[in-house]
A protein has these predicted regions:
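SF2 helicase catalytic motif II
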Residues: 127-129, 145-186
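Conserved adenine-nucleotide phosphate-binding loops and their immediately adjacent elements
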Residues: 2-15
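N-terminal pre-P-loop "Q-motif" helix
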Residues: 12-40
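Walker A/P-loop
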Residues: 34-59
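Residue-level preference for the first positions of well-ordered beta-strands
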Residues: 41-43, 67-69, 120-122, 154
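Short basic/glycine-enriched coil/helix segment immediately N-terminal to the Walker B
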Residues: 35-39, 116-119, 136-153
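Inter-Walker segment of RecA-like/P-loop motor cores
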Residues: 90-138
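Conserved Walker A/P-loop ATP-binding site and its immediately adjacent core
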Residues: 54-58, 62-93, 129
Length: 186
């Protein structure tokens, strides 16, 4: 259901057939995995110009995701994620938060706390920043503890190939796999 376009969004195009198919396959897979009590993980190996950003938002929309975390290995893609969300009519009311620059910039955790919890929130950050560890203590960076405390409806890894096989990424994924195995054994 659309509103009166109070945000003056200008884009109103539909998904292309290949995007619809990717979203449909992912939704079906997620449904089957959840029915079996597993956490779904799905990789889109799509060519450049496929429209993965727009299709990922459409997936989030169809999942009725209210809290979406986008982690990227390539922070330069932030503008594309922000523009797709903030200009398309389908995502009216959705909020985009990210690390901002400048002396007046609010920290991302403050932006999250100030966001309207009644509307979908997309939180964008770099994998290196959000999931990195404090070099002195080896623990979670204090400014990002909140990211790990939220039960995200959907987590998207963008530009996965730029860093997925680095030691920090492998260690994190191994830790997550062990935690999930422990939950399934319970």
């Amino acid at each position: 259901t659309r509103t009166a376009n109070m945000e003056n969004r200008t884009r109103d195009f539909a998904m292309r057939p290949e995007q619809k198919e990717a979203v449909k396959r992912t939704l079906n897979y997620f449904k089957a995995e959840r029915a079996d009590g597993r956490t779904p993980r799905f990789l889109w190996n799509a060519k450049m110009r496929f429209g993965k950003t727009f299709a990922a938002y459409q997936l989030a929309r169809r999942l009725n995701a209210r809290r979406v975390l986008i982690l990227t290995f390539k922070p330069a893609v932030q503008t594309a994620w922000k523009e797709d969300l903030e200009t398309h009519l389908d995502f009216e009311g959705w909020q985009f938060i990210c690390r901002e620059q400048g002396p007046e910039a609010l920290p991302i955790d403050a932006q999250y706390r100030q966001a309207d919890a009644g509307r979908p929130i997309v939180c964008f950050g770099s994998f290196q920043d959000f999931l990195g560890v404090n070099k002195e203590t080896g623990g979670i960076k204090p400014q990002h503890e909140w990211v790990r405390e939220i039960n995200w409806d959907l987590v998207i890894f963008d530009e996965y190939h730029f860093g997925a096989w680095k030691e920090n990424a492998k260690a994190l994924f191994l830790m997550e796999d062990e935690e999930e195995e422990g939950r399934q054994d319970s």
